[in-house]
Amino acid sequence: MGYGAGRDKYEPAATSEHGGKKGKGKGKDRDMEELKKEVTMEDHKMTLEELHRKYGTDLTRGLTTARAAEILARDGPNALTPPPTTPEWVKFCRQLFGGFSMLLWIGAILCFLAYGIRKASDLEPDNDNLYLGVVLSAVVIITGCFSYYQEAKSSRIMESFKNMVPQQALVIRNGEKLSINAENVVQGDLVEVKGGDRIPADLRIISAHGCKVDNSSLTGESEPQTRSPDFTNENPLETRNIAFFSTNCVEGTARGIVINTGDRTVMGRIATLASGLEGGQTPIAVEIGHFIHIITGVAVFLGVSFFILSLILHYTWLEAVIFLIGIIVANVPEGLLATVTVCLTLTAKRMARKNCLVKNLEAVETLGSTSTICSDKTGTLTQNRMTVAHMWFDNQIHEADTTENQSGASFDKSSPTWTALARIAGLCNRAVFPAGQENTPILKRDVVGDASESALLKCIELCCGSVKDMREKNQKVAEIPFNSTNKYQLSVHKNANPSESRYLLVMKGAPERILDRCSSILLQGKEQPLDEELKDAFQNAYLELGGLGERVLGFCHLLLDDEQFPDGFSFDTEDVNFPTEGLCFVGLISMIDPPRAAVPDRVGKCRSAGIKVIMVTGDHPITAKAIAKGVGIISEGNETVEDIAARLNIPVNQVNPRDAKACVIHGTDLKDMNADQIDDILRHHTEIVFARTSPQQKLIIVEGCQRQGAIVAVTGDGVNDSPALKKADIGIAMGIAGSDVSKQAADMILLDDNFASIVTGVEEGRLIFDNLKKSIAYTLTSNIPEITPFLIFIIADIPLPLGTVTILCIDLGTDMVPAISLAYEQAESDIMKRQPRNPKKDKLVNERLISMAYGQIGMIQALGGFFAYFVILAENGFLPSTLLGIRVAWEDRYVNDVEDSYGQQWTYEQRKIVEFTCHTAFFVSIVVVQWADLIICKTRRNSVFQQGMKNKILIFGLFEETALAAFLSYCPGMDVALRMYPLKPTWWFCAFPYSLLIFIYDEVRKLILRRSPGGWVEKETYY
């Protein structure tokens, strides 16, 4: 386990500060490969004399102030180089010109071009194109600002998280202790740390007293690690004499020499590794790109075909170019950009209410397409608090209550042995509750002390009342603190129980060491000699609890003889003058960081949703496996190679790995695997746990999953997780326990640190993908009744049935609210029962969606519009036969005697009023047929009658579009502003039959879909 490049003094990876050529292909790849290697350094193997020579530090007086200033000038401040951030204007431009916006910009430019051509050629300049260009530009700018504002809001929340680095450090220079800003600590400085401090740089410990550090942000180990001057392991991350930058000292004191500062620390290397990783495009960005290709393809194909056709029909070049531009622009769904942005924003808000903060909108959908989740164990799957799980006394195992709300099992507390055990656990314990928490529930209280002692303290407080009172009654007179050589902690107390001796000795520690010091055992409150049978019982209990992945402690006591130890006896803990052997064994207590309540259910949900959950942890394999079984990552009945070997009683190497569905892989084994071996494991095992892994390995695991084609979500809270968070398709950081570095690297933050929230997020992501399909299907359908009038106008030479301004009224007016309302649609079936979508096959917009929207529903809609158009012209005297070829005379403002079918003559003004009335009627017809389209788009497979009309926003959308259409048609002054004229009430009904036809047609199609799944109707029309 470890990080780093194979050099004693490791260089930081290239960042802009160090003149590295970032982003220059080969060099950068090489740097990243360097960073992925494990750390090697020699400092932990050196003697104090060698350290003194290497760093020139006096081991008692420290550096001189002058020398420290020189080193500071040479190495720069002891701080992490901030990751290169994207300037705000670049972010803004991305929103304005990225993806879909580009399509609209091209449309706008083409409009201005068409307007310019008409103006220059002195044809009657028609201002429609100018308006259209302006409106398109406005749409892009407004939605761009909106998306930018959304993301800026999330990044402001991020800014508020920055407070990772330690502020002050205690150094010794010229023999004096100085408190200086941690940024000014230099290599070779002599530094002192005490409980509660953050380690200011990578230190080589030269002296320590009971020092423990919390390395969880670096290695993921939840237990505090002892620090001492002893060289205990070749691996710098495992040895006791190195303390790492930005980890916490939880108790004791230590003095050390700074061996690395800033970016050269182990933590600094990880941060550099994270900031250098490139995240790819999000799945939804890929989808939108694909969609733009389709739309552009259709537009250009239609435009060019009709350009050639209009030349064949003897139009002038100039007119043909204007037609070409007109058709391309008519194909652009102006309202869709806004719809997609609003839909994603709504989902992001909904997720925020469910404790998922999404940093960029596109991540919303990515979570929905996730097929593998690599989850951290501590704090995400578990509660991140050690809790007493089992006890062994009176020769049987009792289960304690580990639930968060104390609703679980309780055990028999009447046995006198339990009273004795609880007394030892409370007295032989240095953990305390800080004052002022009397009204806080016991389990929620803060504790000063290490994780195991806190667990014991809370357990005894819950079962037996105030531990503080117990300690006050049984006053402590002597103590030997825990140390790594004797592996026990002992204290002597004045005994408050008058029926026993004056002094009570209590001891706890590693079970086998405690048992060795005992000659008797307490059963039902009576002392009995410790025979082989009882020793076996102890051994079995110890193995059983250890096998559950729990941390087991043994407890014993001794009532000291009143004659030997009279009142006021002076206990000497240096030269021990009291017995520490021949004690009475009382029992075992085992602790575990228990799983969160909702996790097993959610892991099951992931499994039925086809999502593979992999546990990646820095913890012990036994503990990791126990928790994996507890939360269902390894499901009941599935065995690992070790389980099979134990069952068949054969060596592990004789088991075929393919026989085991589950596997637990140790970090050290992972270190020696090549990419093919990792791929083999990921491919052939469904349930995988990686234990004792380093951050680099987490990154390698993520890359392995991505090679399999998986879309990977990774959760993490430590700095150690940030490279993997950055590399994953979606990185999920923890809001409560997460370090700032991990929050910076992630795409999403879980505000309650709970795995269950991820699954909620997956559900929301899948739902928005379905609903976006529906929104797009709805929006695209009206494109056909908008384009066909223009095409028929060119081919049949008839008066224009639908004008540009009216098209805008549909796309940016009546269609907007209904399209957005589909984002609120409920899921049709259980979304979490289907496999994750395959990004290569299952597209947001596919050929089937286009064929439904353009080829089927859209065509029926166009018929409805034309029907209204011909009805109005016929009522005014122009029968369809008269209209063919009438266009040139109709458009000429100097011809005032165009004859209708009845021989009446029409002036230019009168003709135009009839034409604009037709535009209005065509517009209203599209609104009427879009009612049916909105209702059929609610579902893709179910009948609307099964789904019901529960979506209130959608019902509002139906009324809103109708009200808006009526307003535009009847409001005084609209004839001047938008050239819309009032309609006779009967003309509203022209499109009703077509609306009904659409509804019936689609209900029948969905019925066939449900009756014969996988049939040709599904293959051709299910989008």
Curated annotation (Swiss-Prot):
Residues 109-131, 309-320, 793-802, 867-918, 971-985 are extracellular. It catalyses: K(+)(out) + Na(+)(in) + ATP + H2O = K(+)(in) + Na(+)(out) + ADP + phosphate + H(+). It is a multi-pass membrane protein. It comes from the Eukaryota. The chain crosses the membrane at residues 88-108, 132-152, 289-308, 321-338, 773-792, 803-823, 844-866, 919-938, 952-970, 986-1006. It is found in: Cell membrane, Sarcolemma. One of its GO terms (biological process) is intracellular sodium ion homeostasis. CDD domains: P-type_ATPase_Na-K_like. Residues 1-34, 215-235 are annotated as: Disordered. GO terms for cellular component: membrane; plasma membrane; sarcolemma; sodium:potassium-exchanging ATPase complex. Its EC number is 7.2.2.13. Keywords: ATP-binding, Cell membrane, Ion transport, Magnesium, Membrane, Metal-binding, Nucleotide-binding, Phosphoprotein, Potassium, Potassium transport, Sodium, Sodium transport, Sodium/potassium transport, Translocase, Transmembrane, Transmembrane helix, Transport. The active site is at residue 376. Residues 82-84 are annotated as: Interaction with phosphoinositide-3 kinase. Residues 1-11 have a biased composition (Basic and acidic residues). One of its GO terms (molecular function) is P-type sodium:potassium-exchanging transporter activity. Residues 6-87, 153-288, 339-772, 824-843, 939-951, 1007-1023 are cytoplasmic. NCBIfam families: ATPase-IIC_X-K (TIGR01106), ATPase_P-type (TIGR01494). Belongs to the cation transport ATPase (P-type) (TC 3.A.3) family. Type IIC subfamily. This is Sodium/potassium-transporting ATPase subunit alpha-1. It comes from Rhinella marina (Cane toad). The gene is ATP1A1.
